[in-house]
Swiss-Prot record:
<comment type="function">
    <text>Releases the supercoiling and torsional tension of DNA introduced during the DNA replication and transcription by transiently cleaving and rejoining one strand of the DNA duplex. Introduces a single-strand break via transesterification at the specific target site 5'-[CT]CCTTp site in duplex DNA. The scissile phosphodiester is attacked by the catalytic tyrosine of the enzyme, resulting in the formation of a DNA-(3'-phosphotyrosyl)-enzyme intermediate and the expulsion of a 5'-OH DNA strand. The free DNA strand then undergoes passage around the unbroken strand thus removing DNA supercoils.</text>
</comment>
<dbReference type="InterPro" id="IPR018521">
    <property type="entry name" value="TopoIB_AS"/>
</dbReference>
<feature type="site" description="Involved in religation">
    <location>
        <position position="168"/>
    </location>
</feature>
<dbReference type="GO" id="GO:0003917">
    <property type="term" value="F:DNA topoisomerase type I (single strand cut, ATP-independent) activity"/>
</dbReference>
<dbReference type="InterPro" id="IPR014711">
    <property type="entry name" value="TopoI_cat_a-hlx-sub_euk"/>
</dbReference>
<protein>
    <recommendedName>
        <fullName>DNA topoisomerase 1</fullName>
        <ecNumber>5.6.2.1</ecNumber>
    </recommendedName>
</protein>
<feature type="domain" description="Topo IB-type catalytic">
    <location>
        <begin position="77"/>
        <end position="314"/>
    </location>
</feature>
<keyword id="KW-0413">Isomerase</keyword>
<keyword id="KW-0799">Topoisomerase</keyword>
<keyword id="KW-0946">Virion</keyword>
<dbReference type="InterPro" id="IPR015346">
    <property type="entry name" value="TopoI_N_vir"/>
</dbReference>
<keyword id="KW-0426">Late protein</keyword>
<feature type="active site" description="O-(3'-phospho-DNA)-tyrosine intermediate">
    <location>
        <position position="274"/>
    </location>
</feature>
<keyword id="KW-0238">DNA-binding</keyword>
<dbReference type="GO" id="GO:0044423">
    <property type="term" value="C:virion component"/>
</dbReference>
<dbReference type="GO" id="GO:0006265">
    <property type="term" value="P:DNA topological change"/>
</dbReference>
<dbReference type="InterPro" id="IPR001631">
    <property type="entry name" value="TopoI"/>
</dbReference>
Amino acid sequence: MRALFYKDGKLFTDNNFLNPVSDNNPAYEVLQHVKIPTHLTDVVVYGQTWEEALTRLIFVGSDSKGRRQYFYGKMHVQNRNAKRDRIFVRVYNVMKRINCFINKNIKKSSTDSNYQLAVFMLMETMFFIRFGKMKYLKENETVGLLTLKNKHIEISPDKIVIKFVGKDKVSHEFVVHKSNRLYKPLLKLTDDSSPEEFLFNKLSERKVYECIKQFGIRIKDLRTYGVNYTFLYNFWTNVKSISPLPSPKKLIALTIKQTAEVVGHTPSISKRAYMATTILEMVKDKNFLDVVSKTTFDEFLSIVVDHVKSSTDG
């Protein structure tokens, strides 16, 4: 697809707006079907027919903070939402196997690669931190789980604090209390005398990918699952603890905000980029709140998974 530059309803082949696109270009048909927000700047529209645009990226623009915003066709969004539903169910179905792997290897006396993989997976399934590719650390000093260093771990007698700066320069902080099962394994891995050494110094991207492959999922699937799991836990907790309950709309907005704070991004990104829409539609139902109030979290999670699964099967 060719990138065309947009200004005042017109398209150009160059970003200086000197060479206008022909009026019969199919991209103009696309513009008749979409509304480009007026606050966006540096807008690029992709040359394609309206039929093609339904399943593809349509245009990109910068918001007031300079962040690039991406707008996709309706069918692309529907397919993406359905994919999130499938990922949520798929990861839920393998969590027992993942926990078995963790339990088996975290008991090792040595800190070999399998032990480190167990600690890595335990941290990922607790905090759902971004993977942390080495190239991003080198390019812009973005830290993720794999690229954590000893200097990012602060140890005290009753807790461990994990602090680092991740994607988009967002500061992250996770607390591991002494009573948590992660405390001792993390303490065992950390070497205060080598602050610049990687925490997972016996792992590589390849080793982590090979490990996660045995469960039939991708490492990024755990984060998608984690955002939805965290949302559901917060939603369940809010229904149980807030009195009187706000409207479903306000309750969902509050829960998305809480979830975004935990996983380290904005509420809009949580909703747009990670949330399974089937889950959001399900919790909008006022009658469903009565069900939530009478269940344990595990029962609630099982009900949600069954509903999402039936939606994807249908």
